[in-house]
């Protein structure tokens, strides 16, 4: 008694890059959308080892979203059309109606067979589905493959021994199949018709000796209904499929759905099947198997109802269950860190801030002038936002009082005189995250009110600072003294850079962005750190006691100010006008509206002043001052015109900046006005002559 056909099931073989692609797709594009999307599988004839049988490959580029960008498959590999549904939670994975999901996939194959559209996409006969859940935080992927197979009823059985072709027959067949595959769509290559035709092909060279009494002709499946087998003896007719099975006489999984088509469309109950296992490179080895199969007679060859569908894959232990892979075990630690750093940021775009432009923030090159308390906290917050380029400038060394307040340093950094702060801060950032591009420069920023003693050294520091400012997008002023911020303020504004500033008191802080030279129409330009001064900066360290020389603040003030400063920068970067963004005008009791309304992060204030003594914070909008010692047009024009000559004169001549900016003239006018004030007596304060008012 003939036994029913047995089929070798597909086994999934997933390349590691596919997991990375799925990870990126979920994080950057799909987000909360867990609808099914296309995925491409590939299979091919394999070597004779049973463990390599019926491997369905999922390559790194397998995710497809449409025909325009579908990856092409090599000529020797066959397409399998798949879909993947990557759900949002593990509970969704467990609760998915898997039988219904399989039936839906099976119905797609069945409907294509019924309406004939299968002829355009025969690769649908080898279709598959993937249900998956990607744990983006732990880099674990849970998945379950299904290869929907429509059951034949009655079943097909072998009706004779397996046959094999001769070496000459195989060589001729491989040549014809290869030629045919070049002429058809990639989706048709896995299934075809073959027939033996006596004599030589008309296109063959008549002078070439004919080794076979026949030649092969190959046709697409649709050719069956247009007379491909007309006038061909039954024993010379073959239906064929590319067989990934390596078992001697057990065909691969693609034949199962093909048999439904053979009955319903071809209306056959007996046929010869070529399990095509040959390759061009070894076409003389004759590996293909020919099976003669038949099914019990039936009254009606039409199948009225969709056949039963099975196909959920078994795990390596033979059980019907999902599989899991821990991608973290295979990923390079540096690459793992890259993905993890951006995870929380990209999750913001899923629901909370879909308009957030993370690339703008990531690509902003930041120069931090000062690698102390503010510099440490600012750099960590910048890294939290995904900024990759952070450069430190500081002339100091790590002292024993630093590590408890400055989180980039530790006790060992204080030994042997202390490591240079800027260089050690850059190293610390790389220890935290190797993917950051961080460097440190030990140079002294020339300060107003501090005449130089070594012109060559001071000029070199100035030129190095100028180069660094030109190379970066955002300049952070995080130094200890007021006068050290003056030159970077001038240089940053002259270069058109974003300048961010934070300054601390014992229990207060100011966080601000310096105004740009240009401003939106109808808006007054915003001021800088020095716009409220009535005198030019001078040496603030002279004749000060130790408690005045050190930055004596409540320990929580620096982290608060640093965080606000970085948040202010990111809000500024999200504004369509960038550094030229206007600031809202504070109104008592009124919360300003977002400008523009779709701004991803909200307001972009000019200044934020906070007081920890009262735990209050206020937002201020300050106008630029045309006599400002740092950002007034006279100062900027002089700097642009003379560069180092201007800086040299400002450092050496005490009153130069005040005279040039106009502050000195303002002071003189104020003194003149005070001298001409006519102080009149108030009659209410004059006594009646009986005594003196003390």
Swiss-Prot record:
Database matches in Pfam families: ATG7_N, ThiF
UniProt short sequence motif GXGXXG motif, positions renumbered to this chain: 370-375
Record keywords, A-Z: Autophagy, Cytoplasm, Protein transport, Transport, Ubl conjugation pathway
Keyword Nucleus annotated: no
Lineage: superkingdom: Eukaryota
Enzyme active site: 550 (glycyl thioester intermediate)
UniProt cross-references to CDD domains, sorted A to Z: Apg7
Annotated segments matching region Homodimerization: 650-689
Chief place of localization: cytoplasm
Gene Ontology molecular-function annotations: Atg12 activating enzyme activity; Atg8 activating enzyme activity
Subcellular location: Cytoplasm; Preautophagosomal structure
Gene Ontology CC entries for this record: phagophore assembly site
GO biological process assignments: autophagosome assembly; autophagy of mitochondrion; cellular response to nitrogen starvation; piecemeal microautophagy of the nucleus; protein modification by small protein conjugation; protein transport
UniProt note: phenotype after gene disruption: Significantly decreases the radial growth of colonies under nutrient-rich conditions. Causes only mild infection in point-inoculated spikelets of flowering wheat heads and impairs the spreading to nearby spikelets. Strongly reduces the production of deoxynivalenol (DON), an important virulence determinant.
Function per UniProt: E1-like activating enzyme involved in the 2 ubiquitin-like systems required for cytoplasm to vacuole transport (Cvt) and autophagy. Activates ATG12 for its conjugation with ATG5 and ATG8 for its conjugation with phosphatidylethanolamine. Both systems are needed for the ATG8 association to Cvt vesicles and autophagosomes membranes. Autophagy is essential for maintenance of amino acid levels and protein synthesis under nitrogen starvation.
Subunit structure: Homodimer. Interacts with ATG8 through a thioester bond between Cys-550 and the C-terminal 'Gly-116' of ATG8 and with ATG12 through a thioester bond between Cys-550 and the C-terminal 'Gly-160' of ATG12. Also interacts with ATG3.
Family: Belongs to the ATG7 family.
Domain remarks in the Swiss-Prot or TrEMBL record: The C-terminal residues 650 to 689 are required for homodimerization, as well as the interactions with ATG3, ATG8 and ATG12; and the C-terminal 17 residues are required for the ATG8 lipidation. The GxGxxG motif is important for the function, possibly through binding with ATP.
Name of the protein in its database record: Ubiquitin-like modifier-activating enzyme ATG7
Organism name: Gibberella zeae (strain ATCC MYA-4620 / CBS 123657 / FGSC 9075 / NRRL 31084 / PH-1)
Gene, per the UniProt record: ATG7
């Amino acid at each position: 008694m003939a036994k029913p056909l047995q089929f070798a099931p597909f086994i999934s073989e997933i390349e590691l890059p596919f997991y990375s692609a799925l990870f990126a797709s979920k994080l950057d594009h799909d987000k909360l959308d867990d609808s099914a999307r296309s995925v491409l599988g590939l299979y091919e004839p394999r070597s004779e080892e049973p463990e390599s049988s019926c491997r369905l490959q999922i390559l790194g580029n397998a995710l497809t979203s449409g025909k325009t960008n579908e990856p092409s498959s090599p000529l020797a590999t066959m397409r399998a059309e798949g879909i993947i549904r990557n759900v949002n939670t593990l509970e969704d994975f467990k609760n998915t109606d898997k039988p219904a999901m399989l039936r839906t996939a099976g119905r797609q194959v069945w409907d294509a067979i019924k309406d004939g559209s299968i002829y355009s996409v025969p690769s649908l006969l080898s279709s598959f589905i993937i249900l998956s859940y990607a744990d983006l935080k732990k880099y674990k992927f849970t998945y379950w493959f299904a290869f929907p197979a429509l059951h034949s009823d009655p079943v097909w059985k072998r009706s004779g021994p397996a046959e094999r072709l001769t070496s000459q027959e195989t060589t001729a067949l491989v040549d014809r199949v290869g030629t045919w595959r070049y002429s058809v769509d990639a989706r048709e290559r896995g299934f075809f018709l073959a027939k033996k035709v006596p004599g030589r092909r008309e296109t063959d060279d008549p002078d070439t000796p004919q080794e076979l009494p026949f030649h092969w002709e190959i046709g697409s499946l649709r050719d069956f209904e247009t007379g491909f087998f007309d006038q061909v003896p039954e024993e010379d007719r073959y239906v064929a499929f590319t067989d990934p099975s390596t078992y001697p006489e057990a065909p691969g999984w693609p034949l199962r759905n093909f048999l439904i088509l053979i009955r319903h469309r071809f209306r056959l109950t007996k046929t010869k099947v070529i399990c095509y296992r040959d390759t061009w490179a070894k076409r003389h080895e004759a590996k293909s198997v020919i099976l003669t199969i038949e099914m019990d007679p039936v009254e009606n060859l039409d199948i009225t109802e969709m056949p039963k569908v099975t196909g959920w894959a078994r795990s390596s232990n033979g059980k019907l269950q999902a599989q899991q892979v821990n991608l973290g075990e295979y990923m390079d630690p540096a690459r793992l860190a890259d993905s993890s750093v951006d995870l929380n940021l990209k999750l913001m775009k899923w629901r909370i801030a879909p308009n957030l432009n993370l690339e703008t923030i990531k690509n902003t090159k930041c120069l931090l002038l000062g690698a102390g308390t503010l510099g440490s906290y600012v750099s960590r917050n910048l890294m939290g936002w995904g900024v990759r380029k952070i450069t430190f400038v500081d002339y100091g060394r790590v002292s024993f009082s630093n590590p408890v307040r400055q989180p980039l340093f530790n006790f060992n950094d204080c030994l042997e005189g202390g490591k240079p702060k800027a260089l050690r801060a850059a190293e610390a950032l790389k220890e935290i995250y190797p993917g950051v591009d961080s460097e440190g420069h030990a140079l002294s920023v020339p300060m107003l009110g501090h005449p130089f003693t070594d012109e060559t050294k001071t000029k070199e520091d100035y030129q190095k600072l100028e180069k660094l400012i030109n190379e970066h997008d955002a300049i952070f002023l995080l130094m200890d003294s007021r006068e050290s911020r003056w030159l970077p303020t001038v240089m940053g504004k002259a270069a058109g850079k974003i300048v961010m500033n934070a300054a601390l008191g014992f229990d207060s802080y100011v966080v601000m962005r310096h105004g740009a030279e240009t401003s939106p129409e109808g808006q007054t330009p915003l001021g800088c750190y020095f716009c409220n001064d009535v005198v030019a900066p001078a040496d603030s360290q002279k004749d000060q006691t130790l408690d005045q020389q050190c930055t004596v603040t409540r320990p929580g003030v620096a982290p608060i100010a640093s965080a606000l400063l970085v948040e202010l920068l990111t809000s500024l970067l999200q504004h369509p006008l960038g550094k030229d963004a206007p600031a809202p005008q504070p109104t008592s009791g009124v919360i300003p509206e977002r400008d523009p309304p779709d701004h991803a992060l909200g307001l972009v204030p000019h200044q934020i002043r906070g007081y920890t003594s009262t735990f209050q914070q206020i937002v201020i909008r300050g106008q630029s001052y045309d006599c400002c010692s740092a950002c007034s047009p006279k100062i900027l024009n002089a700097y642009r015109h003379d560069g180092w000559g201007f800086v040299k004169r400002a450092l050496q001549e005490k009153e130069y900046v005040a005279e040039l900016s106009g502050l000195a003239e303002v002071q003189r006018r104020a003194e003149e006005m005070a001298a001409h004030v006519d102080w009149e007596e108030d009659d209410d304060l004059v006594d009646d002559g009986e005594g003196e008012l003390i």
